[in-house]
Regions:
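Outer-membrane beta-barrel proteins
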Residues: 30, 125-127, 171
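Active-site-proximal segments of metal-dependent phosphoesterases and phosphodiesterases across multiple
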Residues: 12-59, 67-72
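Binuclear metal-dependent phosphoesterase catalytic core
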Residues: 72, 76-163
Length: 182
């Protein structure tokens, strides 16, 4: 309650709203099209709705990388659930969704976030996906390439190319599985 009162008292002095807490306030529910609010997150966001500023939430806890745009008509809210620097504890290099063990670096210019980048301990090019040949073949005997995408966002455009040519969507299949490395 004291923290909520502090937010109410200090809201007139802010130019950018970044809320950092341990557990995610919102998450994608695999069976739903919108995130499920947790606890009293909406009550806290209501403190800032008259500011007309975008709200950024930083969270962790789940050992996954996830970005959620919170569906509110009165304000713009994005929550970034960060992967964990220790991975999934028992398997250091990776988190539960296959995201690398990492921390996230944010760059600011004034009140604007100019860049968000994962800093991991393996491949610096491995920002949002890992591509590898799983050794499997399809029904026609052609090799199958597996791709794990983490921290995806519904506004992203996903395009797969083979030797420079776009692969038809009919040849792509989305699956919810653990990363092969995990």
């Amino acid at each position: 309650r004291r923290q909520r009162q502090m937010c109410i008292r200090d809201r007139s002095d802010v130019e950018r709203i970044v809320i950092a807490w341990h557990c995610p306030a919102f998450r994608r529910n695999p069976g739903a099209s919108s995130p499920n609010p947790m606890d009293n997150a909406d009550e806290l966001l209501d403190i800032y709705k008259d500011k007309q500023l975008p709200v950024t939430i930083w969270s962790g806890h789940n050992h996954i990388a996830e970005t959620v745009t919170v569906p509110r008509s009165d304000m713009s809210v994005t929550e970034y659930t960060h992967p964990c620097v220790c991975g999934a504890w028992w398997y250091f290099p990776l988190c539960h969704d296959g995201a690398p063990a990492t921390f996230t670096r944010y760059d600011f210019s004034g009140g604007t976030i100019t860049e968000r980048r994962s800093v991991n301990f393996s491949d610096s090019d491995e920002q949002y996906c890992r591509v590898y040949n799983s050794g499997l073949k399809n029904a026609e005997g052609r090799p199958v390439v597996r791709l794990n995408v983490w921290d995806w966002h519904p506004t992203w455009k996903f395009e797969c190319r083979e030797n420079g040519a776009a692969v038809p969507a009919s040849q792509l299949k989305a699956v919810r599985e653990y990363d092969d490395y995990y």
